[in-house]
Regions:
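Short coil/turn motifs at secondary-structure junctions
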Residues: 68-70, 88, 121-123, 146
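Generic C-terminal helix-cap and adjacent flexible tail
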Residues: 2-4, 144-148
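Conserved GNAT acetyl-CoA-binding A-motif
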Residues: 99, 106-118
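A short, internal acetyl-CoA/4′-phosphopantetheine-binding micro-motif in the GNAT/acyltransferase core
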Residues: 83-90
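Conserved acetyl-CoA-binding loop-helix of GNAT-fold acetyltransferases
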Residues: 91-104, 131
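Conserved active-site alpha-helix within GNAT-family acetyltransferase domains
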Residues: 96, 112, 120-138, 143
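Acetyl-CoA-dependent GNAT
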Residues: 9-16, 20-75, 81, 144-145
Length: 148
């Protein structure tokens, strides 16, 4: 069953409904903390946050997209920085709709590729992205940047 949603660009006023979604992804945050982050992100032309709302106007998904130049390609790279679907809406096509919109935005921005990383333990996410045509190409390593 596909859930009919409206996908639109988020604003900082959406922080109260986006914060719980980030919590479901494993990043607990409240609107007071999230809003300033969104202000910084949305002030940039290369950052977009999409929100999916169901027919009642409830937020059921979010996607953060970053478009940037890289040395390896002539054209920019677009990266999905976050994708989360509310537990009640998973498996209903909301994620696919958000990724399709991100793909459209990436093309409009002139990007040559759409990329995403997921945690090694998220086998369900790996399968989801592969169903959408993404291919596994490598590993991601992360370390904290220490303040001096």
């Amino acid at each position: 069953m596909t859930t009919r949603v409206t996908v639109r660009e988020a604003t900082t006023a959406d922080a109260p409904v986006l914060a719980p979604l980030l919590g479901e992804l494993g990043y607990p945050v409240n609107a007071k903390v999230l809003a300033p982050r969104m202000v910084r992100m949305l002030a940039r032309d290369d950052e977009k946050i999409l929100i999916a709302e169901d027919e009642q106007g409830a937020a059921v998904g979010l996607l953060a997209l970053h478009v940037f130049p890289v040395l390896a390609y002539d054209r920019d790279l677009a990266m999905i920085m976050a994708l989360v679907i509310s537990e009640r809406a998973r498996g209903t096509g909301v994620g696919r709709q958000l990724v399709e919109r991100a793909d459209q935005m990436a093309r409009e921005a002139g990007a040559s590729r759409l990329m995403v990383t997921t945690h090694v333990r998220r086998a369900d996410a790996h399968a989801f992205y592969e169903r959408l045509g993404f291919e596994f190409t490598g590993r991601r390593y992360v370390r904290a940047v220490e303040e001096e």
